[in-house]
A protein has these predicted regions:
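Alpha-helical structural signal in soluble globular domains
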Residues: 39, 128-136, 154, 158, ...
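N-terminal pre-triad scaffold of radical SAM enzymes
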Residues: 35-78, 85-109
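Catalytic cores of alpha/beta
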Residues: 148-157, 197-210, 266-278
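Conserved hydrophobic beta-strand within the GNAT/NAT acetyltransferase core sheet
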Residues: 56, 140-143, 190, 258-262
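Charged helix-capping and loop-helix junction motifs
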Residues: 122-128, 175, 203-207, 237-242, ...
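Auxiliary Fe-S-binding modules of radical SAM enzymes
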Residues: 1-31, 211-339
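Glycine-rich, proline-tolerant flexible connector loops at the mouths of alpha/beta enzymes
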Residues: 23, 55-58, 81-82, 109-122, ...
């Protein structure tokens, strides 16, 4: 049994893959990338089956960055860079959630930015929106920067399922907050961003932090290679390096949801389907954190072509029968409980 196979079996048995082993795996993958991707796919299927989770999202606050942030993740973690323009109404957000459900999303994330819940009006607005989203039949998530234990408990009480937060470099305050959120009974999705000048060792260290935090899901964001707002410190990652990063995360976080988010379309390009083969079991659909639109039907088509199953299917029929008859491209909407 060679190194890749041994590490795959170790991961499937939920024995921690060390940071040194993860780095060696990455080096091994530069010479045998498809073997590493195939092994990561086996780990994904062992823990997640053939299900692929789709997520929708909206920005509650329409804003712009004054410092040319390299990604939406850094944009929302730097409140001094943000110039707020408009707050969406509860009705607008609910309409977007309903549309996300129609697009096959299982989860719907509201992103407010770091300043999102610092006013009573904003807090009241969120506490009204979350129950409404729940009633619509899609699972509500929230990304609103730093919150305390009392706020986490209140969000849980009004029906929030998952809190999303981007992991910063130092991470001390982030880790404390994520633990408080988990203690309140909320699921935690931690975001990480790559392509901002970090080394691969730093990516592995991020995975190690997330493993210690025992988060439920990880959203992977990549600096958008098609964006004009890139700082000098940003780097362009090749599709294969991104795939190897996803694969190593699957080895280190074998039973967690791993979601491809910001920059997935422009950075992975024609290799986007391999992001799932590399170990991802979740996708941001409709749009992503870099605001590059991708038709949700393309995601469903891609999932079907891979022989996998979206947790909420949509009708892909585009023939002239307009739904009156079932065709080979048509599928019934299916909802499944996922927590």
């Amino acid at each position: 049994m060679d190194f890749i196979e041994k590490l795959k079996e170790k991961s499937i048995k939920k024995k921690n893959v060390s940071t040194s082993e993860a780095l060696e795996l990455f080096v091994e993958g530069t010479g045998n990338p498809y073997r590493v991707l195939a092994a990561a796919s086996e780990i994904r299927e062992h823990f997640k089956g053939k299900d692929i989770i789709l997520c929708g999202m909206t920005h509650l606050i329409s804003a712009k960055c004054t410092q040319e942030c390299t990604s939406r993740a850094s944009f929302h973690s730097n409140p001094d860079h943000v110039s707020a323009q408009k707050i969406k109404t509860a009705r607008q957000v609910l309409a977007e959630a309903v549309q996300a459900k129609k697009n096959g999303a299982e989860f719907f994330s509201i992103i407010t930015g770091s300043e999102g819940l610092k006013t009573k009006k904003a807090w009241k607005n969120i506490c009204q929106i979350i129950p409404a989203i729940n009633k619509s039949g899609i699972k509500p998530c929230l990304a609103a920067g730093m919150i305390d234990a009392n706020q986490a408990a209140q969000l849980k009480a009004v029906g929030l399922l998952r809190y999303c937060h981007h992991l910063q470099n130092d991470g001390k305050e982030d880790r404390a907050m994520m633990n408080a959120v988990k203690a309140a009974g909320l699921s935690v999705c931690a975001g990480v961003s790559f392509g901002i000048g970090e080394t691969f060792t730093q990516r592995i260290q991020s995975a190690e932090v997330l493993r210690k935090l025992n988060v439920d899901a990880v959203s992977i964001n990549m600096i958008d290679s098609g964006s004009e707002n890139k700082r000098d410190r940003a780097q362009t990652l090749s599709p294969m390096e991104i795939l190897m990063t996803v694969a190593v995360f699957r080895f280190m976080l074998p039973d967690k949801d791993i979601k491809l988010c910001g920059g997935r379309k422009n950075n992975l390009r024609q290799l986007l389907p391999l992001g799932i083969i590399a170990g991802a079991n979740s996708l941001m659909t409709g749009n992503d954190l870099n605001a590059t639109e991708r038709n949700s039907k393309l995601d469903h088509e891609m999932i079907a072509d891979l022989g996998l199953i979206p947790t909420r299917e949509i009708d892909l029929c585009t023939c002239d029968t307009k739904g009156k008859q079932r065709c080979a491209a048509s599928s019934a909407i299916k909802s499944r409980s996922l927590v």
